[in-house]
């Protein structure tokens, strides 16, 4: 379990990756208390002065002009949570729920939401006890915030709904006991503060970023393996080429390839005097394509790092001035656009890998046996594995269609433009799974191709990648049940073992 002392607004991408991947023991830094208390005092002052303020003593959405009597304020907050818990679909995974909850604690603790410390501490207690509310996967359009999923998260605090602890579902009252809690009664503004925000959208996109980074790292290593398997040239990775263009992502990707390939190997020495002048684009242009993908991940990471530390509640409480101001920080357009751009990168990583696989199948291009197997005709070898890769690459082309350009008005046209950020982030997971499958086939094919090179060795780092696979999957001497091999390679990729072969500084969250 990771220990994390949360200083509001200062979570790093590396910390967020750790929260997603591992249970966390969360504490809130003492520096947060003063601002939290000041925002609560501001809300209480507004009520004492009988001032009208949206979300504090009014209805919501199109009902914002309806003033709520003082005696109904607690019921208003409870009713808000209950009515907005209208999500559908499979439950979000524990890892993602944990990330969502930490993001929500981070935002609330900034002290612009008018929510008491006791409510924030209750969320922290659930996180630390590994009690994860049941949050359905679907039901948010990413404005006004992620209302339905965050309402499901908040239900448990009221003793409603259900939660999962160590893989077992239980009623909210039992779940609260596990965390040493009893049901809360929410004060004015608190229900809205819990529900309003982009934390679900941001968590979805962050998962896409983390998986995309790992796929990027794996694709670098496998692209290097394929260069060696088909007797490709190291010349296209020469630093001078990339410096002349000046694209930072391309320069860094080329440097990573040079690190993986090394200056020379037994394989490269074996064709030093060949007559081939240029390699196909899927080999030669890897730094250009992968560099562009790296730039997309880095830009998305910058946006998501800001959003993870943002206050995306509405209205916001500015305690120093005694003001409560309505705005639109709940609109997750930055997250949606970041996710859309990452979708392009994930699709391109898979597309480029599939082209390299296809190249290895062609004996004229690869100088290897057709479909990487002896006695072709009797044996089909990697023929249909490449077809599988093509199918996955094609799926990703459709999935990469932008979501941020879509919008449907809601709440009787009061909320007339929305971001669709949750859908933009969520489809990244399916795309990542598809690309992982493509890369798994390339890993199998590239190592098979190298093994057909009469015992020649590649560079030290690429030999590591070769050995990792061969410990799980034997050489393909003749046709056998192929799917288990792909599954084994896919599981190795999911373990992030190839990420360790590239410099950590290359990727934002490492």
From Swiss-Prot:
The keyword Cytoplasm applies. It catalyses: L-histidine = trans-urocanate + NH4(+). SUPFAM superfamilies: L-aspartase-like (SSF48557). Coiled coil: none annotated. It is found in: Cytoplasm. One of its GO terms (biological process) is L-histidine catabolic process to glutamate and formate. The keyword Protease does not apply. There is a cross-link at residues 143-145 (5-imidazolinone (Ala-Gly)). Keywords: Cytoplasm, Histidine metabolism, Lyase. InterPro entries: Aromatic_Lyase (IPR001106), Fumarase/histidase_N (IPR024083), HutH (IPR005921), L-Aspartase-like (IPR008948), Phe/His_NH3-lyase_AS (IPR022313). PANTHER family: HISTIDINE AMMONIA-LYASE (PTHR10362). Belongs to the PAL/histidase family. NCBIfam families: hutH, PRK09367.1. This is Histidine ammonia-lyase. It comes from Pseudomonas fluorescens (strain Pf0-1). The gene is hutH.
């Amino acid at each position: 379990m990771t220990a994390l002392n949360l200083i509001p607004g200062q979570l790093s991408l590396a910390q967020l990756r750790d929260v997603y991947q591992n249970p966390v023991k969360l504490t809130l830094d003492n520096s947060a208390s003063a601002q939290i208390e000041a925002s609560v005092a501001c809300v209480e002052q507004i009520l004492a002065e009988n001032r009208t303020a949206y979300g504090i003593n009014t209805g919501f959405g199109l009902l914002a002009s309806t003033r709520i009597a003082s005696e109904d304020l607690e019921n208003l907050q409870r009713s808000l949570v209950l009515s907005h818990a209208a999500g559908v679909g499979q439950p979000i995974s524990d890892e993602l729920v944990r990330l969502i909850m930490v993001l929500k604690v981070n935002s609330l603790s900034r002290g612009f939401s008018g929510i008491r410390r006791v409510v924030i501490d209750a969320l922290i207690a659930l996180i630390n006890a590994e009690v994860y509310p049941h949050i359905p996967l679907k039901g948010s359009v990413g404005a006004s915030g992620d209302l339905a999923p965050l309402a499901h998260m908040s239900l448990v605090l009221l003793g409603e709904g259900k939660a999962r602890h160590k893989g077992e579902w239980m009623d909210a009252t039992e779940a609260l006991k596990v965390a040493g809690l009893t049901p809360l009664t929410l004060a004015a503004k608190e229900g809205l503060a819990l529900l309003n925000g982009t934390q679900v959208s941001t968590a979805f996109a962050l998962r896409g970023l983390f998986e995309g980074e790992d796929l990027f790292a794996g694709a670098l290593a496998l692209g290097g393996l394929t260069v060696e398997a088909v007797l490709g040239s190291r010349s296209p990775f020469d630093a001078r080429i990339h410096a002349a263009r000046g694209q930072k992502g391309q320069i860094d990707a080329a440097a990573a390839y040079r690190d993986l390939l090394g200056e020379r190997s037994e394989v490269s020495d074996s064709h030093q005097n060949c007559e081939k002048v240029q390699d196909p684009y899927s080999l030669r242009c890897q730094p250009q394509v992968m560099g562009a993908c790296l730039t997309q991940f880095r830009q998305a990471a910058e946006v998501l790092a800001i959003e993870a530390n943002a206050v995306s509640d509405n209205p916001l409480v500015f305690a120093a001035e005694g003001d409560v101001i309505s705005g639109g920080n709940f609109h997750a357009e930055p997250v949606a656009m970041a996710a859309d751009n990452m979708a392009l990168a994930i699709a391109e990583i898979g597309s480029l890998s599939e082209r390299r696989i296809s190249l290895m199948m062609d004996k004229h291009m690869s100088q290897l046996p057709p479909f990487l197997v002896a006695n072709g005709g009797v044996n089909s070898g990697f023929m249909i594995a490449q077809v599988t890769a093509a199918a996955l690459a094609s799926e990703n082309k459709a999935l990469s269609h932008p979501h941020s350009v879509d919008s449907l008005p809601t709440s009787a046209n009061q909320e007339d433009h929305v971001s669709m950020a949750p859908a933009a982030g969520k489809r990244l997971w399916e795309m990542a799974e598809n690309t992982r499958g493509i890369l798994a086939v390339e890993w199998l094919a590239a190592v098979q191709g190298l093994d057909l090179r009469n015992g020649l060795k590649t560079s030290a780092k690429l030999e590591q990648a070769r050995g990792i696979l061969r410990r799980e999957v034997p050489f393909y001497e003749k046709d056998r049940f192929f799917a288990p091999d792909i599954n084994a390679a896919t599981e190795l990729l999911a373990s992030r073992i190839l990420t360790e072969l590239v410099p950590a500084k290359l990727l934002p969250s490492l």
